[in-house]
């Protein structure tokens, strides 16, 4: 089987990671004790178990154990997961935690506290990979604004890349939001992380809390969304992206096929993700939804999980992962229509740049759904925003001593910043022919912010 090992790093990574396991366990009929629920329907049972080895290891007693490594630099989140209803699902040895925490400091996660823990994490990762017949790759859940998910998360990614250079590395990265800021040093942590992700990851699914909040307010009409609601949205996307890997389907996919179809140039592997139809936690969508409606919704900026409007850029490539009893012909027609009617939103030099796949098994609570992955040049907005905040602080050397005390040098910050700015420039270059104009605008915007910061 084509196995995938998941690594959850930091508080955010562990929370969205454990929610993902809850969702897919339910889809595969795995109970919280790890045993299959059984049932009368032999056909359903066969579908649920046929490719379950991708994410689960079957123990001798018939228990299914997630191929997951749970890492944090403090015990709090890991202990909460152990005590949760699904805590007994995981292998106890796969919980690894330090005592001191990273204190929202990337350098602590990457250089000091993280280094002490990294070898024991890699031992567990090696043990998990040895239990695989044919390892497909790794899936990492983390945030890039804190200390552990960003610092230790990127350290693990680079170490795993060294040891398994030919396996896929896919990350679900929660990016700092412009409005929902949790700590003042987020721009530093995020810039240093993006620098690592450009070099060492194959696919990065960008998610941010502001976009998730907007979905909860506008679409789901939740007045006070909590992290449970946000994690529900993230887990819907994760379940959708991975369903073709976990279930037998008409058009199956794997991490490498996804990458080959979505990444025209190796550095441009940062994706916008979306989901339709959007439903609140615990709610079900009983309205009969059609494939044309799903297609329209999935390209809507309101359904995107990152605060970046795809209409500000162009699609280099996109992938639509449909779920439910859907005819291939209908999907192909819709994809063709979208590209014909909205040709201005797609680059001309990649023909037929939407890939689609279909998985027969719908998610819980709705008869059909679609998950969307787009390689859109508008993703540069995320990086520009981080860069502007980074520059405002770095010019004053604000908060820098927290990083230099851990042994970092200023040069690392400069390198990370220029790598991220290069990435923005590359996205601009491929977005249209008027590259100079775009570049000029970005330069002016930067100079404007520099002047504001200096005044």
Curated annotation (Swiss-Prot):
UniProt-listed InterPro entries: Beta-tubulin_BS, Beta_tubulin, Tub_FtsZ_C, Tubulin, Tubulin/FtsZ-like_C, Tubulin/FtsZ_2-layer-sand-dom, Tubulin/FtsZ_GTPase_sf, Tubulin_C
Subunit structure: Dimer of alpha and beta chains. A typical microtubule is a hollow water-filled tube with an outer diameter of 25 nm and an inner diameter of 15 nM. Alpha-beta heterodimers associate head-to-tail to form protofilaments running lengthwise along the microtubule wall with the beta-tubulin subunit facing the microtubule plus end conferring a structural polarity. Microtubules usually have 13 protofilaments but different protofilament numbers can be found in some organisms and specialized cells.
Gene3D superfamilies in the record: Helix hairpin bin, Tubulin/FtsZ, C-terminal domain, Tubulin/FtsZ, GTPase domain
Tree of life domain: Eukaryota
Residues the record lists as binding GTP: 11, 74, 143, 147-149, 209, 231
Similarity comment text for this entry: Belongs to the tubulin family.
GO cellular component: a single term: phagocytic vesicle
Keyword Cytoplasm part of the UniProt annotation: yes
Protein name: Tubulin beta chain
Disulfides per UniProt: none
Residue positions binding Mg(2+): 74
Cofactors demanded by this protein: Mg(2+)
Lineage per the UniProt record: Eukaryota, Amoebozoa, Evosea, Eumycetozoa, Dictyostelia
Biological role stated in the UniProt entry: Tubulin is the major constituent of microtubules, a cylinder consisting of laterally associated linear protofilaments composed of alpha- and beta-tubulin heterodimers. Microtubules grow by the addition of GTP-tubulin dimers to the microtubule end, where a stabilizing cap forms. Below the cap, tubulin dimers are in GDP-bound state, owing to GTPase activity of alpha-tubulin.
Keyword terms of this UniProt record: Cytoplasm, Cytoskeleton, GTP-binding, Magnesium, Metal-binding, Microtubule, Nucleotide-binding
Residue segments, region Disordered: 426-455
Subcellular location: Cytoplasm, Cytoskeleton
Main location: cytoplasm
PROSITE patterns: TUBULIN (PS00227), TUBULIN_B_AUTOREG (PS00228)
Biological-process GO terms, alphabetical: microtubule cytoskeleton organization; mitotic cell cycle; response to bacterium
GO terms assigned for molecular function: GTP binding; GTPase activity; metal ion binding; structural constituent of cytoskeleton
Biased composition (Acidic residues): 434-455
Pfam families, A to Z: Tubulin, Tubulin_C
């Amino acid at each position: 089987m084509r196995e995938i090992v998941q690594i959850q790093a930091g508080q955010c990574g562990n929370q969205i990671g454990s929610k993902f396991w809850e969702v897919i366990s339910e889809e595969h009929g795995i109970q919280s004790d790890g045993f299959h629920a059984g049932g009368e329907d032999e056909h359903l049972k066969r579908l649920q178990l046929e490719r379950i080895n991708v994410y689960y290891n079957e123990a001798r007693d018939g228990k299914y154990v997630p191929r997951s490594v749970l890492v944090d630099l403090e015990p709090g989140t890991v202990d909460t997961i152990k005590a949760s209803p699904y805590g007994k699902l995981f292998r106890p040895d796969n919980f690894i935690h330090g005592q001191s925490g990273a204190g929202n400091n990337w350098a602590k996660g990457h250089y000091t506290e993280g280094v002490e823990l990294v070898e024991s994490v890699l031992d567990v990762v090696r043990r998990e990979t040895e239990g695989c017949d044919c390892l497909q790759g790794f899936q990492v859940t983390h945030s890039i604004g804190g200390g552990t998910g960003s610092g230790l998360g990127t350290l693990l990614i680079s170490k795993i890349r060294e040891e398994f250079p030919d396996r896929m590395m896919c990350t679900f990265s929660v990016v700092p939001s412009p409005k929902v800021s949790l700590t003042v040093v987020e721009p530093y942590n995020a810039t240093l992380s993006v620098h690592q992700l450009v070099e060492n990851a194959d696919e990065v699914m960008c998610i941010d809390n502001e976009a998730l909040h907007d979905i909860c307010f506008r679409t789901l009409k939740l007045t006070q969304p909590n992290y449970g609601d946000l994690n529900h949205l993230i887990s819907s996307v994760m379940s959708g992206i991975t369903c073709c890997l976990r279930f037998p389907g008409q058009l199956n996919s794997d991490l490498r096929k996804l990458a080959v179809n979505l990444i025209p140039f190796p550095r441009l592997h940062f994706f916008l993700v979306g989901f339709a139809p959007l439903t609140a936690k615990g709610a079900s969508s009983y309205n009969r939804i059609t494939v044309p409606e799903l297609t329209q919704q999935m390209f809507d900026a309101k359904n995107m999980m990152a605060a970046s409007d795809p209409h500000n850029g162009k699609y280099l490539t996109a992938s639509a992962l449909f779920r439910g009893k859907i005819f291939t012909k209908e999907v192909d027609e819709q994809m063709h229509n979208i590209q014909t009617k909205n040709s201005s939103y797609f680059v001309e030099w990649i023909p037929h740049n939407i890939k689609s796949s279909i998985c027969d098994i719908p998610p819980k609570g709705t008869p059909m759904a679609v998950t969307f992955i787009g390689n859109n040049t508008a993703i540069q907005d995320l990086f520009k925003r981080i860069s502007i905040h980074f520059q405002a602080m770095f010019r004053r050397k604000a908060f820098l001593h927290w990083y230099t005390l851990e042994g970092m040098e200023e040069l690392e910050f400069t390198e990370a910043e220029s790598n991220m700015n290069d990435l923005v420039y590359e996205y601009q270059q491929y977005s249209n022919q008027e590259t100079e104009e775009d570049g000029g605008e970005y330069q002016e915007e930067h100079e404007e912010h520099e002047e504001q910061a200096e005044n």
